[in-house]
């Protein structure tokens, strides 16, 4: 009996091999379903190949994510409800791709470049959904300031074109609002915004209230919502990088925004665990940290164009040291803007923490005078922070520290430096002027 089964298997594989070599589509079948992925017999499948699962009532797209013995692991893009053992799996000979080009600017699209409103898109081209490998010698040094349009960021944590930075904060502190301000007010030629794992309700709110009509005009918005397959969330992030590199290759300065890279990590963890990877810190698999590093490294200044990356990072319990994703990204990125819940409660929006935030490239981008004034301001704020509670309950003794006394005497002006309405734009020159005024008050 075993001999008959072995001969049938050899005959099947030979027939599949002939079909594959002749360019015909090879098919197999589902043999089991395990949670969010399927096991199938599918000869000649490669990791990353797209497949189509055909049942009596549905056609579901999916992707090969790994192997287990002689079986192929398939992650469907849609829920597997209604599929059954023996359903046909058709191997597509091409890798997964997305539509990109000028036709998607001003559009809200899925990870494959299809407009979510079902409308028409103009000229586009197909590009594979894979992260680029960038020759380090093709990169240029980052020398030019990137104007975010946000006063506190421009003045105290100046960014450069091609820099990658994270916005770190707990839930509800204003990450998305700050991201929307930078989207609307920055001087980027094209903005690529990836909304990964957002609730469906929040997507519409973000587009209308945070991004706005003006922000959308120069943006490509890639959406993969919380209720979708984890592989679609990962594809959404990769799709955003593909769009960004397409426009950068045309010599444009691109701003790549991702909200949030934490949800991307959670999605990749699901895929990694399903594929049999060993869990490490808090269940995160090795592929999570590799993916985050590759996403971050896709940014930079190139011989043609640049990609400036800003990623929101959801910090568990507002403590970066206890969050493996936040802690890992601190070492991968070129700086961090930390939002403070304490400042948010006091109505200081954007709630940027001036003492803990940092741009590693700032010393190479600004004048010595600018850098000195920014450091002085942060040093003074650090000293004030040490005694702030005493000041607010009336136990601080005036004269203990002359610099702290100056902050107390000018506290309203100091706090107004950080306050900025979402619709208010403050360019780089205006930000420097505001810093000069604060410096003259405190010096």
UniProtKB/Swiss-Prot annotation:
Highest classification ranks of the organism: Bacteria, Pseudomonadati, Aquificota, Aquificia, Aquificales
Enzyme Commission identifier(s): 7.1.2.2
Descriptive protein name: Flagellum-specific ATP synthase
Job of this protein: Probable catalytic subunit of a protein translocase for flagellum-specific export, or a proton translocase involved in local circuits at the flagellum.
Keyword field contains Coiled coil: no
Catalyzed reactions: ATP + H2O + 4 H(+)(in) = ADP + phosphate + 5 H(+)(out)
Principal location: cytoplasm
InterPro entries: AAA+_ATPase, ATPase_a/bsu_AS, ATPase_alpha/beta_chains, ATPase_F1/V1/A1_a/bsu_N, ATPase_F1/V1/A1_a/bsu_nucl-bd, ATPase_T3SS_FliI/YscN, P-loop_NTPase, T3SS_ATPase_C
GO biological process: bacterial-type flagellum organization; protein secretion by the type III secretion system; proton motive force-driven ATP synthesis; proton transmembrane transport
Compartment annotation: Cytoplasm
SMART domains reported in the protein's UniProt record: AAA
Pfam family, one: ATP-synt_ab
């Amino acid at each position: 009996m075993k001999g008959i089964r072995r001969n049938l298997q050899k005959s099947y594989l030979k027939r599949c091999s002939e079909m594959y070599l002749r360019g015909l589509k090879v098919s197999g079948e589902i043999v089991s379903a395990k949670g969010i992925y399927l096991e199938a017999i599918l000869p000649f499948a490669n990791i990353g190949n797209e497949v189509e699962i055909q049942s009596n009532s549905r056609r579901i797209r999916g992707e090969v994510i790994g192997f287990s013995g002689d079986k192929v692991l398939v992650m469907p893009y849609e829920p597997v409800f209604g599929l059954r053992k023996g359903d046909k799996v058709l191997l597509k000979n091409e890798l997964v791709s997305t539509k990109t080009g000028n036709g998607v600017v001003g559009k809200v699209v899925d990870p494959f470049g299809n407009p979510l409103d079902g409308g028409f898109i103009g000229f586009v081209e197909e590009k594979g959904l894979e992260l680029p490998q960038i020759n380090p010698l093709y990169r240029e040094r980052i020398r030019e300031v990137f104007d975010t349009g946000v006063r506190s960021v421009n003045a105290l944590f100046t960014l450069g074109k091609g820099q990658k930075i994270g916005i770190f904060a707990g839930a509800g502190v204003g990450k998305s609002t700050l991201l929307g301000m930078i989207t609307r007010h920055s001087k980027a030629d094209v903005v690529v915004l990836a909304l990964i794992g957002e609730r469906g309700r929040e997507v519409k709110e973000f587009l209308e209230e945070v991004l706005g009509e003006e922000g959308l005009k120069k943006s490509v918005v890639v959406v993969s919502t919380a209720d979708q397959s984890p592989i679609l969330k990962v594809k959404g992030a990769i799709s955003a990088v593909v769009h960004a590199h397409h426009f950068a290759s045309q010599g444009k300065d691109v701003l790549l925004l991702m909200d949030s890279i934490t949800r991307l990590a959670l999605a990749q963890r699901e895929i990694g665990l399903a594929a049999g990877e060993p869990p490490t810190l808090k269940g995160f698999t090795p592929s999570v940290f590799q993916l985050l590093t590759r996403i971050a490294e896709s940014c930079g200044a190139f011989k043609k164009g640049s990609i400036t990356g800003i990623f929101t990072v959801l910090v568990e319990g507002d403590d970066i040291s206890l969050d493996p994703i936040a802690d890992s990204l601190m070492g991968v990125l070129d700086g961090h803007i930390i939002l403070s819940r304490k400042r948010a409660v006091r109505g200081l929006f954007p709630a940027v923490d001036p003492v803990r935030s940092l741009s590693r490239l700032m010393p190479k981008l600004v004048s010595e005078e600018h850098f000195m004034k920014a450091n002085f301001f942060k040093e003074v704020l650090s000293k004030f922070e040490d005694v702030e509670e005493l000041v607010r309950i009336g136990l601080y003794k005036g004269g203990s520290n002359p610099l702290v006394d100056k902050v107390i005497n000018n506290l309203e002006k100091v706090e107004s430096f950080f306050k900025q309405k979402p619709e208010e734009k403050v360019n780089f020159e205006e930000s420097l002027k505001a810093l000069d005024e604060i410096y003259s008050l405190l010096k």
